[in-house]
Structure formats: C-alpha cells, structure tokens
C-alpha cells in the first residue's frame, strides 16, 4: 500500500449471486447479523469473519471497507463504504453510490486496507488458497500478491456439487434463545401449530403427543407460556426420541469424484482413494463425513500422516492438535494397512453440517462429538483398506518383477545350451523359455492373491 510500508490493500472479487442492496450495510456492518431464520449448510453467514476484518482494519488504519455488489439480473451495481459503530453495533455508511449494470455483472467485490506483515502471512495465505482448490476443483482462482507473485489455479472440472436446500430447524437442535426469537416473530398461535410451522419433521399428531407428554396443552397460545415453561419445553424437545431424523438435503458434500479430482490437482499423488459417508446426525443436526487418503507422487514422506481438515468446505489451518480428526488419525494402527513411516501419506477429512461443533470460538478445530468421531473413524478405515489393497498389489508386482529378472538372468545361457543339444536356433528356445517363466510367475501370483485375500479378511476384522 502506497501510504505505509506495513499497510496491505486487499481486494477480493467473486462472480456469485451478489447481495441485496438493503442487506449490504448490515451484512458487513453489524456483528452477528443474519437475515436467515432457516437452516442449511453455510461456509459462513457473515457472523464474525467479515466483521473481524473490518474491525481490525478500523483499529489499525481507520479506513472503511468498500463493498461493491450486484445480484443476478440486476440493472444496477451498488457500492457502500462501511465502518462499524462499535458502541451501537450498527453500520456507519461513509459513502454510497450506484450505477447502471451495463455489462450484466453479478457478484461481490470487497476492498479493505489493514496493517499486516506479508512476509509472515504469505505461507499461510498460499496454503489456504491451495486447500480451497482441493475441495473446490470447479473453482478458478487468480491471486496477485504484494510482492508481484501471481497464483493462477485453473478449474479441473465444470461439475458442481449439489447445493444445499433451506429448511426449518430440527426440534432437537434448538436452544432457549432460538425458541424465544421464534415466538417473538410468530404472533399469536396455538403451541401445537407453532411447533408444526417452525420445526422440521413435526406434524400435528407428533406435536400433540409431545406436548401432552410434557404437560402443556397443545391448544394453548404460545405467547402465554412463561419462561419456566419455555425452558421446560426446550429441554424436553432435546430429550424426546420420537422426532423424525433431520433431513440430509440441507447439506452439500464435496462428493467422492470431485474430492479425488481436487486432491490429484493439488497434491499430484500416485494414488487417491475417497469416500462420502451416509448422512448422520448429532443433537438434531445433520452431518456428513468425507475422507480420502493420498499416497506417493509428489507427497513428501513424513513421520506421521499429514492431515488436511475442512468444515463446510472451509480449510482449517490452526489448532490441529485439538481436532477430532487428529485424534482419530493418531489412534489408527497404520501397520494394519501396510504403511510404514516415514511414509508419503496424506489424510483428508471434510465434515459438512448445518451446525459444526467447533472446539472453541476460533473455529479452527472440531470437537470430539461421539457421533462425528465414529463417522470419521469409519470413513478413514474405509479408505485405508483400499490403500492397503493398492499397496499389496504394488508389493506383489515388485516381487513378480524381481522373480522375472532372476529367472531371465540366466535364461540366455540355458537357451544356448538347449539349442546346441537339440540343434535348433537359440532365439527360438529363448522365446519359449520366457513364455514358460511368465506362466509360472502368473501361477504363483494367483496362489498368493488367494492367500492374501484370506489374510486381508482377517486383518479387516481387526481394523
């Protein structure tokens, strides 16, 4: 940045769906603001991330953030220069303008000036971009760094993951504060009607049965409930086991094929094996675990597996030691999967959910929730077994090549002796010898494969 050596000018632009004009000031200028009252998987809903950038910029350079956005099909492009009134938690609009959208552009562009040390941050920024490309192989990214270096990441596919749908919260997933907000927005209605209209998987009969079981009249007006009754109802909602399971179409996993493509593009390994587990849930929150292992190629050998962690397609760079993924990976007996360290092994885990259970407010590690831990363990074991099959085959191929080399080492001398005895050409004998050797090696490989399958089934029981 021209004014100061330690100031950085950061500009980010996408070609997404854009932000409605009236929402822009609040989205960027009000902490914990969200216009959503329904649930679905989000990379983020502008709760803290963008606001922390603005507040840091304010405190170090006293400059506003510039936001330019246009929705798809909009005739106008809108610009706001925004700061945050930290006392009132309100946006301060420093400048505002709009112009005709001549080129039918849509998306959002953000410009911010903040204090920073690029030399220290460079590695982490580049690593973050690399990891985004791993779970978004359909994205194209162009990054120009302060030192003039350019990172161009081309998309490797035009296939997109299925976007998440929006839905109502599950009754097991809400807290007292959320229910109070729902009550304040829903006016006068019977408690049973309130539950049917505001929670997923709750029909009239289910609502009536639940309310009767906790001693609340289904026909009573929701506004008549006092704080103790609301607290009692929410507590029992979490304990009740007759609710329908949370829907999984609120989620958008990367998908096995896209995950493999992203890993191949980013890490350039020798082999990749990925899986997407079936949907599961914890405390009424649906989630899906995806895992992959990458082996060899340009992966450097390490004394333990290198881990890449993602939550709702967002890379997690810090606090790995407190993450459930690190704990599970460290518990795996990799000897069962024919991995001997140091080894060129990477483990990738992506967890998507309507509510990621982070271990701390920093949102850099996922907590040890039993349901999630179990799914992570099963996913890693599944891809590790496929890696074991691959490594076993490689081992057998190597042994077969050594056998072939050993047999053929003296084949010419043997062929020469046989040819002189039989009075035929040496090449004719040599060709027949090679065919016999190949048949013999294939026969031995077939026997070993049958024996190996039995051994693998035994190990699979242990794993």
What are these regions (language model features)?
Residues 25-27:
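ATPase catalytic-site recognition across NTP-hydrolyzing enzymes
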Residues 14:
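Acidic ATP/Mg2+-coordinating residue in the GHKL
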Residues 8-9, 21-23, 34-181, 220-233, ...:
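GHKL-type ATPase core
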Residues 151-177, 206-209, 216-220, 300-395:
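GHKL/Bergerat-fold ATPase module
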Residues 17-18:
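Glycine-rich G1-box
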Residues 192-213:
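Helix-hairpin-helix
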Residues 2-10:
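Short beta-strand-loop-beta element adjacent to the nucleotide/active-site pocket used for signaling
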Residues 178, 184-187, 198-202, 233-239, ...:
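Charge-rich (often acidic), low-complexity intrinsically disordered regions concentrated
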């Amino acid at each position: 940045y021209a004014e100061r050596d330690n100031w950085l000018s950061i500009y980010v632009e996408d070609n997404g769906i854009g932000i409605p004009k009236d929402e822009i000031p609040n989205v960027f200028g009000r902490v914990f603001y969200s216009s959503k009252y329904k649930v679905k998987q989000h990379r983020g809903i502008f709760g803290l991330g963008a606001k922390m950038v603005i507040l840091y910029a304010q405190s170090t350079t006293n400059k506003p953030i510039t936001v330019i956005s246009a929705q798809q099909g909009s005739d106008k492009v809108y610009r706001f220069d925004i700061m945050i009134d930290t006392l009132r938690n309100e946006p301060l609009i420093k400048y505002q303008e709009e112009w005709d959208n001549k080129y039918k552009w849509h998306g959002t562009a953000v410009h911010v000036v903040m204090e920073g040390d690029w030399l220290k941050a460079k590695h982490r920024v580049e690593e973050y971009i690399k990891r985004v490309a791993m779970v978004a192989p359909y994205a194209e990214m162009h990054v120009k760094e302060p030192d003039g270096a350019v990172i161009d990441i081309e998309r490797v596919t035009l296939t997109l993951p299925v976007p998440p749908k929006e839905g109502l919260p599950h009754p097991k997933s809400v807290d007292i504060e959320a229910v109070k907000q729902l009550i304040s927005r829903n006016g006068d209605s019977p408690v049973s009607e309130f539950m049917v209209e505001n929670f997923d998987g709750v029909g009239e009969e289910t609502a009536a049965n639940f309310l009767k079981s906790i001693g609340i009249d289904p026909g009573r007006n929701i506004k008549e409930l006092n704080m103790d009754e609301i607290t009692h109802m929410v507590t029992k909602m979490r304990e009740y086991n007759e609710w329908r399971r949370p829907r999984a179409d609120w989620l958008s996993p990367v998908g096995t094929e896209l995950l493999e493509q992203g890993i191949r593009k980013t890490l350039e390994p020798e082999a990749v094996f990925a899986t997407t587990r079936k949907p599961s849930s914890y405390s009424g929150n649906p989630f899906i675990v995806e895992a992959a292992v990458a082996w060899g190629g340009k992966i450097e050998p390490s004394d333990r597996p290198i881990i890449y962690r993602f939550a709702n397609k967002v890379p997690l760079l810090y606090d790995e030691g407190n993450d459930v993924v690190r704990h599970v990976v460290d518990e795996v007996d990799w000897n069962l999967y024919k991995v001997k360290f140091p080894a060129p092994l990477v483990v990738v885990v992506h967890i998507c959910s309507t509510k990621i259970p982070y271990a701390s407010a920093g949102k850099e590690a996922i907590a040890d929730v039993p349901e999630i831990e179990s799914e992570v363990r099963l996913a890693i074991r599944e891809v590790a077994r496929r890696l074991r099959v691959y490594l076993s085959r490689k081992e057998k191929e190597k042994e077969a090549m050594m056998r072939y080399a050993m047999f053929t080492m003296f084949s010419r001398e043997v062929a020469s002796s046989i040819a002189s005895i039989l009075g035929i050409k040496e090449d004719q004998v040599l060709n027949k010898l090679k065919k016999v050797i190949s048949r013999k090696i294939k026969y031995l490989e077939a026997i070993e494969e049958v024996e190996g399958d039995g051994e693998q089934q035994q190990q699979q029981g242990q794993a």
